[in-house]
Design a protein with these regions (language model features):
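Catalytic-domain carbohydrate-binding cleft regions of carbohydrate-active enzymes
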Residues: 31
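Short, surface-exposed loop/turn segments at secondary-structure boundaries that line and modulate
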Residues: 44
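Non-catalytic C-terminal accessory modules of carbohydrate-active enzymes
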Residues: 15, 19-24, 34-38, 47-56, ...
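An alpha-helical repeat/solenoid feature that recognizes helix-turn-helix modules
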Residues: 1-6, 59
Length: 239
């Protein structure tokens, strides 16, 4: 998340986390492996039975922060895996036994514990909006930089999110007619309520704040973004 790890180190971190910590039945990534002993001299976490709270549970806050860091570094598929597993676990009522939402953690049986106690839900939403859909502010301007996977687009090859920016309701809709995966598409065209927005040569989109604040607040405005395949000569993921 701080940007310290090099790309190869990130790959190794993901490989290790998947090998030692990922448990789909429990809801995703555990905090640690089972040390098979009680270690009270190492603090609070080892005072719990394995699979509960800080000792090896699937801790929602840490998972969402891990996903956020992966997205920031361009590892969208790996970040999506972390978020989607949490969602699927929470939505599986027969196992999680909770109302819709993100609990503090999932225990060894995959049951959601301490509902509404965690900040993970806000981290989850922030990551989905600002990283997955790539809708975020920068020095007051509205920037678009999606990291959506091919399978996240619907039957119309569309993926959309509703946000409020500078008090203005906005729907951002991405159109991916080629159903390209992240890293294989680029932004080709952007329209704000049918008015075309300029795209910089490096294909980054930044809508000035004054253009947004001039919009009416009493209706939802629409930003349509067309994604097209990156030319084969430069078809590589940019981290």
């Amino acid at each position: 998340m701080s940007g310290t790890a090099q790309e190869e180190q990130i790959r190794q971190i993901v490989k290790a986390a998947d090998a030692y910590l990922y448990d789909a039945k429990a809801g995703g990534y555990r905090l640690n492996t089972d040390f098979h002993e009680r270690k009270d001299d190492l603090g609070r976490m080892f005072g719990f039975a394995y699979g509960h709270k800080e000792n090896g549970a699937v801790f929602s806050h840490m998972t969402t922060m891990y996903a956020n860091a992966l997205y920031q570094r361009g590892f969208a598929r790996e970040g999506y895996k972390a978020l989607h597993t949490l969602y699927e676990q929470a939505a599986n009522f027969e196992v999680s036994r909770i109302y819709p939402g993100i609990p503090e953690y999932f225990n060894d049986r995959g049951r959601g514990m301490y509902h509404y106690l965690t900040g993970a839900a806000s981290w989850y939403m922030m990551t989905v909006v600002t990283q997955m859909y790539g809708v975020r502010g920068r020095l007051g301007d509205l920037c678009l930089s999606p990291k959506l996977l091919a399978e996240q687009f619907d039957e119309d090859h569309r993926a959309a999110v509703n946000v409020e920016f500078a008090g203005v309701p906005i729907e951002v809709a991405y159109h991916n007619d080629g159903l390209c995966d992240y890293g294989a598409y680029r932004i080709d065209q952007v329209r704000l309520d049918e008015a075309e927005i300029e795209i910089t040569p490096d294909r980054k989109v930044s809508i000035p704040k004054n253009k947004v604040t001039r919009l009416s607040h009493d209706r939802t405005h629409r930003i349509d973004v067309r994604l097209v395949p990156i030319e084969s000569s430069s078809n590589r993921k940019v981290r």
